[in-house]
């Protein structure tokens, strides 16, 4: 066993094998340091003397205790939280860190029929391939943002007029029921659950057929992005307004279900008046469009719709202000941008 955590007795003698380790006590709902001296029995919390503990390996030892303690009087408040003057602007960087500090993952998708998790919500040890709910949620939120989603987090019953405080590790806010509540809300707002409507027939018919030339084969548009087969010189391909090329038999079935380019999500007009109204509202919010409503859109007309949804989170610090009533559930509302 490593001697890094060895405890030195009062007389200066080194007590071999005695170590201090951080644990999370589920009874006290906080991190504690437990002195372990083999071959003793299972570790117990020095505060409540209970054994409902999980060893905690802090990935960032300079960050201090990362666990959220709902009782801010038990340990110094400033050691646990970061003060945020602008809650919404400051919350997003915590949820969406830079790519250099985020593990790359494939597209995340949440099953809305089974959003709950089983097993411990924090895995400081064990199987490196074990499911990590916090990484999963973070990657899923990044996927939503990359597809144009605007995510607004609302803290319910916030008693502070000067902003509010969040855990240094935002993942620690969502533990137990709070974590499952967040997953449920994300599942209800997953754009993959609904998708975009089909492209209009007139827009599909207006897509040009282009002859594949050597210049195409030497460019980034040298293969169909659906079937991934290389184009052959002299053959024809359908071209989207964004200039991406596809085999006709690959693109048309997709456009009969979704109006977006499979690569860049550039959107064709639809026959859905409600959806078109949201598109116009989104474009008006971002600076308007050029007024061209025909099937052929100009290259500068970005029809990627920014989906917006709101995630309501309960105010967790009961000692700092009133929390939601026990029967209250966080609600998520799909917001139109017009």
Swiss-Prot record:
Zinc finger (RING-type): 224-265
Enzyme Commission number: 2.3.2.27
Enzyme class: transferase
Disulfide bond sites: none
Basic and acidic residues composition bias: residue spans: 267-279, 298-309
Pathway: Protein modification; protein ubiquitination
A GO molecular-function descriptor: ubiquitin-protein transferase activity
Catalytic activity: S-ubiquitinyl-[E2 ubiquitin-conjugating enzyme]-L-cysteine + [acceptor protein]-L-lysine = [E2 ubiquitin-conjugating enzyme]-L-cysteine + N(6)-ubiquitinyl-[acceptor protein]-L-lysine
Name of the featured protein: E3 ubiquitin-protein ligase RING1
Taxon lineage: Eukaryota, Viridiplantae, Streptophyta, Embryophyta, Tracheophyta
Gene: RING1
């Amino acid at each position: 066993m490593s001697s890094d955590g060895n405890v030195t007795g009062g007389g200066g003698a080194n007590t071999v094998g005695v170590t201090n380790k951080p644990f999370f006590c589920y009874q006290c709902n906080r991190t504690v340091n437990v002195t372990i001296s083999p071959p003793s029995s299972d570790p117990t919390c020095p505060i409540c003397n209970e054994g409902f503990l999980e060893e905690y390996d802090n990935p960032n030892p300079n960050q201090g205790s990362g666990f959220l303690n709902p009782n801010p009087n038990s340990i110094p408040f400033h050691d646990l939280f970061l003060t945020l003057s602008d809650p919404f602007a400051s919350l997003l960087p915590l949820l969406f860190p830079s790519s250099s500090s985020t593990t790359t993952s494939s597209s995340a998708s949440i099953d809305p029929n089974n959003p709950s998790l089983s097993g411990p919500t924090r895995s400081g040890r064990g199987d490196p391939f074990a499911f990590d709910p916090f990484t999963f949620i973070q990657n899923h939120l990044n996927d939503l943002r990359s597809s144009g989603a605007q995510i607004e987090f609302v803290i319910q019953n916030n008693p502070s007029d000067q902003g509010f405080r969040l855990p240094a590790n935002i993942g620690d806010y969502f533990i137990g029921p709070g974590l499952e509540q967040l997953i449920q809300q994300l599942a209800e707002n997953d754009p993959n659950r609904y998708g975009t409507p089909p492209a209009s027939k007139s827009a599909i018919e207006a897509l040009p057929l282009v002859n594949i030339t050597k210049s195409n084969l030497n460019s980034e548009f040298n293969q169909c992005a659906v079937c991934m087969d290389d184009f052959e010189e002299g053959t024809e391909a359908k071209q989207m307004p964004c200039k991406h090329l596809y085999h006709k038999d690959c693109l048309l079935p997709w456009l009969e279900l979704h109006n977006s380019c499979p690569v860049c999500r550039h959107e064709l007009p639809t026959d859905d008046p409600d959806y078109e109204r949201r598109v116009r509202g989104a474009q008006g919010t971002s600076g308007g469009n050029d007024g061209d409503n025909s099937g052929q859109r100009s290259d500068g007309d970005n029809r990627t719709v920014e989906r917006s949804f709101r995630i309501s989170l309960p105010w967790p610090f009961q000692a700092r202000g009133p929390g939601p009533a026990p029967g209250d559930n966080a609600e998520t509302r799909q917001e139109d941008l017009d």
